[in-house]
Amino acid sequence: MDFNLSREHQLVRKMMAEFTENEVKPIAAETDKTSQYPRENIEKLFNLGVMGMCVPKEYGGAGADPLASAICIEELSMQCASTGDIVATHNGLCCDPIITHGTEAQKAKYLPMLTKGHKVGAFCLTESDAGSDAAKGQTEAKLDGDHYVLNGSKIFITNGYVADVFVVFAMTDKSKGTRGISAFIVESSFPGFSVGKHEEKMGLHGSPTAEIVFTDCIVPKENLLGQEGKGFKIAMQTLDGGRIGIAAQALGIAEGAMEEAMAYTKGRVQFGKPISKFQNTQFTFADMAMRSEAGRLLTYQAAVLKGEGKRFTKEAAMAKLFCSEHAMLTTTKALQMFGGYGYTKDYPLERMMRDAKITEIYEGTSEIQRVVISGNIGL
């Protein structure tokens, strides 16, 4: 059992730490304030090979493993969780299911678009009445000759109004429940595709979230991803992998908050000494550091298992649950150390705290993670 990162993974961390410090950190506050999609930085991440980094080299990707991807998301999210979210969604929720379930023709067409072609990807599962209970989805896909016709809508879609390629789930046979759900690769240029409401969110203001609407949307038959009726299984497998990305994002948020709080408390003098010298402050930081190390081990373990082709459902759920709750707790305690200043926008803690909350909700709430974990330990 080797807990040391390989040289390649160390280089990935170094590259992303430098990029985050030089490119992401300087615009993070403005990105949050204006709710602007960080387009220039995403283009730079395409050029660095981070977008679609786990795509095999023969399709234009870097051929990296899930651990490398998690490290990238962790580093980005230390300064801008929105950027980490955009990357995590593109890599884990769009590229990954095409890599895993796509035909050779689908991979040859879409994976180069999602890497060298600088096309952004998204994932369409959630509906207004189908959140945690994904099987309640009402979006329908009816086969009509050489194409499917999709009707319905999806909500809370990350990358929604900037993405070009979407992995979409729809009912092809409502009588079969989860076995009647199928997956499709849908382009934003397809007839009948449109973007609806742009969501105004509590946090992740730089992450473009929107409603996606299908009105007699024409999808070529060859864009069926996997087999008819296998969509629910594809969705659940994809979310397993996506949870590693959210765990890494949450871990990064927590680490960023801890760094900000440590720097502040070393310089903030009260009662004749820096508040970092008070034992209660030190104990709080000790707990933060301990939880970060535990979260990192859980996240990296899940990523390594995924990379080895082993079952990782339980481990991914544990990592996502632990790290998201760690992020919320750490940002709350870090903000408290800033006192009144922490409640202002002069410091990044209030943004980090707002960003942290969603990690307990999306890609499976904390409650759903506990359901997954309990179901995988023999209960």
Predicted regions, residues:
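Short Ser/Thr-interspersed hydrophobic loop/turn segments at strand-loop and sheet-helix junctions
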Residues: 49, 73-77, 170, 186-191, ...
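A short core secondary-structure module
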Residues: 147, 151-195
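A short, Trp-centered hydrophobic/proline-enriched beta-strand micro-motif
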Residues: 117-125
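Short glycine/proline-enriched turns and hinge-like loops at secondary-structure junctions
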Residues: 64-65, 133-135, 159-164, 177-180, ...
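Flexible, small-/acidic-enriched active-site or ligand-binding loops
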Residues: 136, 189-220
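Short Gly/Pro-enriched turn/cap motifs at secondary-structure boundaries
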Residues: 114, 129-132, 156-159, 173-175, ...
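Conserved hydrophobic/aromatic beta-strand scaffold that supports enzyme active sites
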Residues: 122, 138-140, 147, 165-169, ...
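Alpha-helical interface subdomain recognition
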Residues: 1-89, 101-106, 113-118, 131-134, ...
